[in-house]
Amino acid sequence: FCKNITENVQTIQHLHLPENPVSTASTAFPCGMWFTAMDYAEILTGKSEAEFRAAVQERFQQVQALGIQTVFLQVRAFADAYYTSTYYMPGLSMSADCSFDPLQIMLTEAHQSGLSVHAWVNPLRCQTDAQMEQMPEQYPISQWYADETKRGTWLVKSGDRWWLNPAYPEVRQLIADGVTELVTQYEIDGVQIDDYFYPTTDASFDAAAFAESGASDRSAWRKEQCNRIVQAMYNAVKQTNPKVLFGISPQGTLSGNEKQSADVQTWGQTAGYCDYLLPQLYFGFQNSTAPFAETAAFWAEQVTCPDVSLWIGICTYKIGQQDTWAGDGMTEWQTDSQVVSKELELLCNMDGI
């Protein structure tokens, strides 16, 4: 969807993807691509339905030609919705007079191109003060922002934006209702959440809820709140349509997930949390902190539940670039043009993936 889609396609064409694309999300070797809400802006903001549909058709035809089978479409990025929603305001990149449903168009065109669609949701991340003040009053998050008893508890500011606090059942219910709405209204193949859980380790974020809980271990308690929100979303999907998949795409390292209280080991080892884990292994083989081969092997050991599949997320945006935080592997992506090809080859031959 982005301006450099042609360049990206040319890059991906060298990655030895499967030659025979299939339309289901349960293939033995799933190959997918994420599209962010920011990617839509170029073809959505100020565009007519016909213009948007034509642009979507072009991009999905390119994606399908690569052998990619699944697209992960971000439908909620900042407490907004790129679909018709009772609970969330229209997407921030949608024009005020937008009269069509972006998700429905993308879903129709994807399925016609033989692509399965997973609706990608950020459940907790909200908006800045300026954006929150413009949010229509009919939506629950706007009402909570205006309520002094909810602002600072159910809805908490961290950095320059607001976040939902998963410690409250009303918050978890809103998020579950949003998932139910998606699965009820649209013939999607899956729902996915990514790596945004607790935005900070600062104890002030949820001090009141933690004090009320009577718990003594904040780290364990926060993990339990994340587990509750994940289970609520999983149950919302399965109770609405058991055939729809629910997946989680967490950070690529255990330490990164620990900082966000994301209990990835429980999710990979226990039924009832997700159908697949898709950790983001955006690393090269020479990365000092998280070398790709060892990190992939670590994840293969964590996902032991027979009901949970392990998929691996890799990146192409580092090709030809300096990997600033990679330590000894800082120049790997500049000196080796085959990093991604080697990663794919390793993954195809690794048990458990």
Feature map (PLM): residue ranges:
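Active-site-adjacent "subsite" loops/lids of carbohydrate-active enzymes
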Residues: 23-53, 118-119, 124-181, 185, ...
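Short, acidic/polar
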Residues: 45-64, 171-182, 256-272, 292, ...
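Aromatic- and glycine-enriched glycan-recognition loops and surfaces
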Residues: 47-66, 91-113, 224-229
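Polysaccharide-binding and catalytic clefts of secreted carbohydrate-active enzymes
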Residues: 52, 69, 104, 146-270, ...
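Catalytic domains of carbohydrate-active enzymes, especially glycoside hydrolases
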Residues: 54-80, 185-190, 272-276, 347-353
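Aromatic-lined carbohydrate-binding/catalytic grooves of carbohydrate-active enzymes
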Residues: 66-100
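Aromatic- and acidic-residue-enriched segments that line the glycan-binding/catalytic groove
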Residues: 83-95, 125-157, 195-214, 328-332
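Substrate-binding cleft of secreted/luminal carbohydrate-active enzymes
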Residues: 269-291, 298-353
